[in-house]
Amino acid sequence: MRKTETMVQLSPSRTLETLTPSELTVEKDDGQGSPKPESPRMLSALQLALSSTTVYCGYEKYIEDGLICLKHKIRNIEKKKLKLERYSDKLKKGEKLNEDQLEAVGKYDEVVHNLKFAKELQKTIGSLTQDLLKAQRKAVRQEKQMKTDEEKSRLSLMLQVQYVLHSLQREDVRKNFCNTRQYSCYMSTQDMEGLMDLASLVGCKRDYSISLEDQMRRAAIVYWELLEGNEKPVAGSTYKHMKEKLLRLVDSGFFDNIPLPKSDSQEKTETIKPDSQSRPSGLTTLVKLSSNEVPSKEFLNRRYMPETDERRRGETASPRNWKEDFLAMKEREPPDSWEMEELADPPASSQSPIQKPWKGAAGLIPKTVDIVKRSTTDPKEKRQRKKAEQDSKSMPVAVEVFSSPSPLPKDPVQRRQQLETLMDQISGSFSFMQESLLDGESSPVNTQTKRCRPSPGSSTPIVQRELTKSPSDILPSSQRSTPLRILLSGEGKGCLSNGDRSINGSDLELHSEDKPRKQAEGFNSPPLYRRGSSISVSLENQSTVQAGRQMLCNGVSSSGSAQTFSTPPSRRSISAENPFHNIHSVFNVIGESSGMKADESGFSESIHRSFTSAKTSSVTTASTQTPPELNPPEEDLQIEGQYPLECAVSAGGPVFSSSHSRVGQSCYSRGAVRGGYDAYRVNVRSPGGSFMSQTHREPASALYMARENGYQQNFKRGAGTATQRSSAGWSDSSQVSSPDRDGAYPLDSGLSDTLSIPAMEVPMNPQGPHTLMPVHVYPLTQLRVAFSAARTANFAPGTLDQPIAFDLLHTNLGDMFDTGSGRFTCPATGAYVFIFHILKLAISVPLYINLMRNEEVMVSAYANDGAPDHETASNHAVLQLFQGDQVWLRLHRGAIYGSSWKYSTFSGFLLYQD
């Protein structure tokens, strides 16, 4: 009760409505760090400094301050009215009040009257202020418009004076002006000399003794004095007299139509005449050019159009220019799609097509590229056809033309071989002639003859593709899948029996080394586009290759191919000396035909293989196929999981066949492991040789089978059927652009969580292929960035736009926040979250806070209620930052309150990293 008496105690000489808010409120001690409003009467030195720096824009600012003061008065009177109403209610209920409270209740009607009067006064002053501000703004606009018009008129007058002075520099204009009776009265000879001197002062002529800037500055002073019309002397007269003379000349009308000088008119006529004469000559030359180049029509097969360079008529090409053109084309246009091109050989060598390497799954349908570029205009196209015809006549090029003499030899064997080669070239990626697999098993000699057709007429042919037939060759092109790497098997080696070949394991780069006999002929086949190192395989003859292949199938190395295969660093190294040195012999091959058949069948992307006995090997191929040129070698392939098509299904889970007695299944049963990456999905092979199905999942580690050579483990998402997962089963992705080539590999755990793991090297030990090797998977390290800073001292700069520094740091993960400058430096590109809360000092100046990214304002905060109270300005933002960006807070205007309770804070953290 004593406290209430203190709050409502009135001064005998003052009324309630005239009291200030500080006099009506008694503050109690809230603690050490609580903000306390100061009285406006007792201004500190800081507040006086801020008030002195505050700039008032105009009279409307004073009116706004008066309205704010009146608003606070009304609010205080309303509070007093509510207090008196409570006292009246207590008095009606019979409660006792002291003398001061009874006196205050007696003045209730006066307080209500004062409140009503104050509200009406506020409304009236507000409307008058709006009218006054509108009138003031209108007057300011009119004044500004008048100043603009005046400046425009002065500028126009200056340009007119400048034009008159420049025109008087011409002698013909001066003579014409003085000799004309109508204008001779405007100016005497003395006035003309004075104007000439004035023209030199205003810069009509360049004075090279001084700089251009100094000359124009002096001319500007002369123009200013001239437009003002002062009585200062200049050029034997005054500025006022000169201005009057110049205005008379401008108003005379003589300078409205001044004839051009004769020299300029003559130059214009001379420039027009050569243009009119040059036009008919250009037309005649164009007619001559078009008449000389009348092409003759000729049928050309664009699929096998030779690469020729467009040359001018009558120019002969050297015999080896086509090599330079071919190499330049390869460097300019790398092989990115399936294309067919043909290089033309001299008549001494036969045609041998060249095919660009098959690359990735860019498209499953092969396409051809027109080598002869077409133009948009008909005359140019005709000229190009004419040039192509002349080049074909000058160079011995093998072009397929109708009704041409047959180049086939008379020997029936060679004639048959060349016809089959021509059929393969015409068929392209489609196979119109199919062969039986049974014939190959029964007659290996015939099969080898069909597979390997040496190119007649040349011992070093240009290899376009392997002239081999496998089960993948028989299927149509519409069912081709993503091509794998080339098959280094005996069938391909037999076709390349002459000379040493270099085959790239990654991009199918085929070229032939020069032989001394071919160097004598003076013609070499150009190498195709090369991207990496090649795999050198020495092939002496067909029998050696067949014997070596049979020994490789039995696990015995061949001494004839003891060379090292060198590949790019990203590939795994392959040694042909003993590629199966750590693999147990699990099957035997009896007879040359069965070994050839198993080797010739190739490894297609969707192949399914099962070895049912130790004496026979059966091969089953699916509907899709891979071109035979890009089948990977057997040494590079490792069967990770089998997906047989026709197998029994057991009730307890999948059962896989081994060399003893194995039964597989073609579908998943309940509890079988599905999804996940390959090593997680495939079934585990026990050391005994049988397969076990995994019915549980353990994301902590995975089991991998040992490889026969160094291998970099890759992970893929497991999805789809067995045919779709066949590329993952063979673990060969050298020709396919996939996420496995990147640094991080997505790993699907099957539990709706995705981990990103780096590529790992699995150490290989000389042990059997059935050994299980645990490899632990760890996620990538997440970048930890977060900070939280506070300010414990007041901050009131005397100027605008000052950075805010923070003297207390709660958190600084990553050490990217600098307390001295208050700036956060972005360590990595990503999305960041920033939050700030700034408390305004209890003064009448509003608070403006800007969140800055480098020098750009991202978000802002404002705090002001029109009274000297504490207010908080806060905001937040989610920003996309790049590495090196700086984020900081800027105090645009106002002052910040700081205490040990840390009211002003600035925080931020990394949301996600790009």
Swiss-Prot record:
Disruption phenotype: Morpholino knockdown results in a dorsalized phenotype, with enlargement of the telencephalon and reduction of the tail at 24 hours post-fertilization. Expression of the dorsal marker goosecoid is expanded, whereas expression of the ventral markers eve1 and tbx6 is reduced. In addition, expression of the telencephalon marker opl and the midbrain/hindbrain boundary marker pax2.1 is expanded posteriorly. InterPro entries: C1q_dom, Caprin, Caprin-1_C, Caprin-1_dimer, Tumour_necrosis_fac-like_dom. It is a peripheral membrane protein. Residues 780-914 form the C1q domain. GO terms for molecular function: metal ion binding; RNA binding; signaling receptor binding. Homotrimer; via C1q domain. The C1q domain is essential for the function in Wnt signaling. Promotes phosphorylation of the Wnt coreceptor LRP6, leading to increased activity of the canonical Wnt signaling pathway. Facilitates constitutive LRP6 phosphorylation by CDK14/CCNY during G2/M stage of the cell cycle, which may potentiate cells for Wnt signaling. May regulate the transport and translation of mRNAs, modulating for instance the expression of proteins involved in synaptic plasticity in neurons. Involved in regulation of growth as erythroblasts shift from a highly proliferative state towards their terminal phase of differentiation. May be involved in apoptosis. This is Caprin-2. The gene is caprin2.
